[in-house]
Amino acid sequence: MEKSYYFSKNELVLLLGTGNVTEIYGFQMPSESEFDDNAFTMALYQLVKRGCIEIVQELELSKDMKWMMEVLRTCKKVLSVVSAKGCEQKCWYLAQSGALVMELPILSEEVRVRLISQEKITEEIFAGTDLTEKPLENEATGRKIENFQSSIKKEGEELLENLSINMDTSQKDILEIEDANGIKNIVSVWDVADMKVHALVERLVFYEGSLGYRVLVLKDESRQVVFDSIEFRKKLQESLL
């Protein structure tokens, strides 16, 4: 199962309220002052027209919308991805029953919502990103190449030493960072939040280097640079699920 919907922010607020979802991590929603009676009426009209809400004795969500709210209520982890190209922000809400992906395109006020079944999550996480489809096999391969290319090893060391960011630095600010030559080599920032504690627990900064992508991993109090590899991606996917 994969289905896509496009909602205005006001329509999304109304759906969340109807589904008893009081907040969603990682996404900026309209304030109460922006959501007046007229906005409510227009949002309700559009949702009823599209079959997302039915008016009986009270507002009732369609089957897909109920599933969407269930994922938001029960998700264990949230992955927020901001890339230098493409979607301004993409949030993955990951639950046992499947995943819900919200995308806020740069040139649109509408939020794209995708419903993805559990068995499709693994292949979908890296699909549509700016990252290469064929990274290195594993970390060991990158380390072996470093032994013959000192410049590549130095590149990783400089990334760890010079990229002075932490968990409080915004994703968009990180993407604006330039190297010594004024080049923006950071292509994507991935934040992982644990919904048990409602807090950011891991940050991955993808940097385009001489040998594919390097990843600065911030977790707990540790900082390390690893190669983007099939091995790394598999471990990341397993940790998210």
Residue locations for each model-derived region?
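Non-catalytic recognition/regulatory regions in large multidomain proteins
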Residues: 4, 24-28, 54, 59-241
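Short, amphipathic alpha-helical interface elements at domain boundaries
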Residues: 1-48, 54-58, 67
